[in-house]
């Protein structure tokens, strides 16, 4: 092969052909070179109606929801659809035993009944600009050859602010700018974003619909979950972002989705826009090994222990179930994902494929007289090996204690608070106590049970102590051996008995007569301090290994782009707006088994189990089924569709993403992937990978027949 210069990135990619027909989480700027193929697959829209850098398009109806999901605007009054699991925390926050919206659902029959939410946002992408030349020019001014500024969010934000101009945000209310790196720092894009924070809960089905199948069915196809919730964006009277106010009005958006009742058939065109979070497409073989045997294995083991304790307590007490349902669900999602990824690595040859890819690059580089690609691979391999023990200890403390034990987040008094408590200024002492109380209440809130936390802690610490040698333990944890003869239960009981944070009553007693000395000797504070000291120590010891890997990855990815300039390459997901397209299609997971593309309400009833909370069927939904009262939402055969699957390429962050037909009309909401395709974060698996999508007709049926909320249907533009 003749030696070639690396073409400008977008130009090089424009020459490529797709490796797998439906693979790719494509940048919006890459639409032009994918458009012809999309048309061949069935797309009937104009290119500029999907993405128009100089005007409005369907892109303007897609939002980043609450920092980690996707949503879509479906009315001219700012109505937003997303997944039930994306809105779960907000639904839970409004739930009580008296008004249990998690169990019974919530439907605002008037706009005045819509519920405000704390600390929530939706973000529109106003503009996307290629700033690669600008960033690289600025980077040339950096003299340090080992500088990592080319990937530094802080540095890139400085460049974004500089490029946007002085007082940009002041002149443009609600707007902000951000530069993100792609392909390991070989491409840079600047995003202009508009963020709204007055976002109100409008509707949510009962969890028996929105979470039907729960953890048993998570990552599984066939699926029967009505995973949706409804919110509304509010703005000031000029349409600008504003904090919550009764004077705010529903947002009039630039664009919103029409909703199709046409349904789907096998091989129909399907397309998704959204904000995929993280993928590892450019991992080397050693990085795949590390991800599996350290990161995923530890996450699986420690979360399995924690979730086992939580589930037992939730099933034994309805109040605990309300309090811990969101925590359990959040933990389960990453847990199941790790299991699925490891399964794919083991059974689908992903590690071997990455080995073949890097071997091919090394051989190609040698022919070009370019040893730097081989050097990059060797640098990655060596660094992964060097950091293995530190990384294992880091993941154990993160999954086993930081994420696993709630009281590990006990408030550690600041220097200013300590001084205030030592002084004679009563108001300063009160302010210090109030600040400590606020931090205490962040974990010991209405959704906290000290008894559950104790049981989780005993289980987690027992496992942690088996894995970590005594000399590497956080200092306070060494007391398990030194003072309690290895009795973890006695250690945890002692912490709660003697800590001012052991209960609200204990904290109130302390607050009445605050003592710096008591805080300094508090076992929960000492536990938290020693845990975070060790966590920071491990983090700081691992940091020096990051830079050589990131620099080597930049070279490695540049080599792949140069070598395969005649093939498509898309950047790893990083929570930026992307599109993917494919077909509605079933699949065969193994010999003599085929899963069709569509599930129906018949399957919900087949799975019904009144004695298993995961498969309880809502009585209103059951009545609709028994009457066959499906109306205009039924399919051509008269059955009620629930979900379908498609070959689109998605990952975490795509939850809630709009799924469109060939006309750009909304046909469903993406909410999951199948087990067999979860390894798509590393490598797309064409025969197995499927996005799992709740059918929009099921969403509408539930709003109509279960929620009885006709006003929402009247607000949407529903087409045949």
From Swiss-Prot:
Changing residue 655 to A: Loss of catalytic activity. Changing residue 673 to G: Drastically decreased but still significant activities against Asp/Glu substrates, as well as detectable activity against substrates harboring hydrophobic residues at the P1 position. GO terms for cellular component: cell surface. GO terms for molecular function: dipeptidyl-peptidase activity; peptide binding; serine-type aminopeptidase activity. It is found in: Cell surface. Disulfide bonds join 69-86. GO terms for biological process: developmental cell growth; peptide catabolic process; proteolysis. Keywords: Aminopeptidase, Disulfide bond, Hydrolase, Protease, Serine protease, Signal. The active site is at residues 85, 227, 655. Changing residue 337 to A/N: Significant increase (or preservation) of the catalytic activity. Its main location: other. Catalyzes the removal of dipeptides from the N-terminus of oligopeptides. Shows a strict specificity for acidic residues (Asp or Glu) in the P1 position, and has a hydrophobic residue preference at the P2 position. Preferentially cleaves the synthetic substrate Leu-Asp-methylcoumaryl-7-amide (Leu-Asp-MCA) as compared to Leu-Glu-MCA. Is involved in amino acid metabolism and bacterial growth of asaccharolytic P.gingivalis, that utilizes amino acids from extracellular proteinaceous nutrients as energy and carbon sources. Belongs to the peptidase S46 family. Homodimer. This is Asp/Glu-specific dipeptidyl-peptidase. It comes from Porphyromonas gingivalis (strain ATCC 33277 / DSM 20709 / CIP 103683 / JCM 12257 / NCTC 11834 / 2561).
């Amino acid at each position: 092969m003749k030696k070639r210069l690396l073409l400008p990135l977008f130009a090089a990619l424009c020459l490529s052909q797709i490796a797998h027909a439906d693979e790719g989480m494509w940048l919006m700027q890459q639409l032009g070179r994918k458009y012809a193929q999309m048309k061949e697959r069935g797309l009937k829209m104009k290119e500029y109606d999907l993405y128009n850098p100089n005007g409005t398009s369907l892109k303007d109806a897609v939002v980043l929801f609450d920092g980690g999901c996707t949503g879509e605007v479906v009315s001219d009054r700012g109505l937003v659809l997303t997944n039930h699991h994306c809105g779960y925390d907000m639904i839970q926050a409004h739930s009580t035993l008296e008004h249990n919206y998690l169990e019974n659902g919530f439907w605002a029959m008037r706009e005045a009944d819509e519920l405000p939410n704390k600390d929530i946002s939706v973000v529109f992408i106003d503009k996307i600009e290629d700033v690669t030349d600008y960033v690289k020019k600025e980077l040339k001014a950096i003299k340090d050859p080992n500088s990592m500024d080319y990937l530094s969010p802080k540095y890139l934000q400085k460049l974004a602010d500089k490029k946007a101009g002085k007082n940009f945000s002041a002149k443009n209310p609600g707007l902000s700018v951000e530069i993100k790196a792609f392909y390991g720092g070989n491409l840079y894009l600047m995003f202009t974003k508009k963020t709204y924070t007055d976002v109100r809960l409008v509707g949510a089905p009962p969890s028996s619909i929105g979470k039907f199948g729960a953890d048993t069915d998570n990552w599984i196809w066939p699926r029967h979950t009505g995973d949706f919730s409804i919110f509304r964006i509010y703005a000031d009277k000029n349409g600008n972002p504003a904090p919550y106010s009764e004077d705010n009005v529903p947002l009039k958006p630039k664009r919103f989705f029409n909703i199709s009742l046409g349904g789907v058939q096998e091989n129909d065109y399907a397309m998704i826009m959204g904000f995929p979070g993280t993928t590892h497409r450019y991992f080397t073989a050693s990085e795949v090994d590390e991800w599996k045997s350290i990161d995923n294995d530890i996450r699986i083991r420690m979360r399995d222990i924690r979730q086992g304790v939580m589930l037992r307590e939730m099933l034994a007490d309805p109040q605990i179930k309300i309090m811990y349902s969101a925590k359990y669900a959040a933990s389960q999602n990453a847990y199941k994902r790790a299991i699925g990824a490891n399964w794919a690595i083991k059974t689908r040859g992903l590690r071997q494929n990455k080995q073949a890819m890097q071997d091919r690059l090394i051989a190609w580089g040698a022919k070009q007289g370019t040893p730097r690609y081989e050097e990059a691979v060797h640098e990655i391999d060596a660094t992964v090996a060097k950091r293995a023990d530190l990384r294992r200890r880091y993941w154990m403390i993160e999954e086993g204690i930081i994420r696993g034990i709630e009281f590990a987040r006990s408030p550690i008094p600041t220097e200013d608070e300590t001084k205030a408590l030592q002084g004679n200024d009563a108001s300063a002492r009160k302010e210090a106590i109030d600040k400590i109380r606020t931090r205490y209440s962040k974990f010991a809130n209405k959704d906290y049970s000290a008894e559950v936390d104790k049981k989780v802690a005993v289980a987690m610490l027992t496992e942690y102590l088996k894995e970590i040698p005594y000399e590497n333990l956080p200092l306070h944890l060494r007391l398990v051996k030194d003072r309690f003869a290895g009795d973890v239960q006695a250690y945890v009981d002692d912490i709660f008995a003697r800590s001012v944070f052991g209960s609200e009553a204990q904290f109130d007693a302390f607050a009445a007569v605050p003592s710096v000395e008591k805080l300094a000797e508090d076992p929960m504070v000492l536990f938290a301090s020693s845990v975070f000291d060790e966590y920071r120590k491990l983090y700081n010891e691992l940091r020096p290994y990051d830079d050589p890997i990131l620099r080597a990855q930049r070279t490695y990815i540049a080599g792949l782009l140069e070598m395969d300039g005649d093939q498509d390459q898309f950047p790893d997901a990083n929570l930026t707006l992307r599109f993917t397209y494919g077909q509605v299609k079933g699949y065969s997971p193994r010999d003599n088994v085929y899963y069709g593309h569509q599930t129906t309400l018949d399957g919900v009833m087949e799975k019904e189990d009144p004695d298993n909370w995961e498969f309880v069927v809502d009585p209103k939904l059951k009545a609709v089924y028994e009457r066959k009262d499906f109306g205009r939402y039924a399919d051509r055969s008269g059955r009620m569709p629930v979900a379908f699957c498609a070959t689109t390429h998605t990952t975490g962050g795509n939850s809630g993403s709009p799924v469109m037909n060939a006309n750009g009309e909304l046909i469903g909401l993406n909410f999951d992937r199948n087990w067999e395709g979860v390894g798509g974060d590393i490598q797309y698996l064409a025969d197995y990978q499927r996005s799992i999508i709740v059918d929009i007709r099921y969403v509408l049926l539930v709003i109509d027949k279960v929620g009885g909320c006709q006003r929402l249907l009247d607000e949407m533009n529903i087409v045949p």
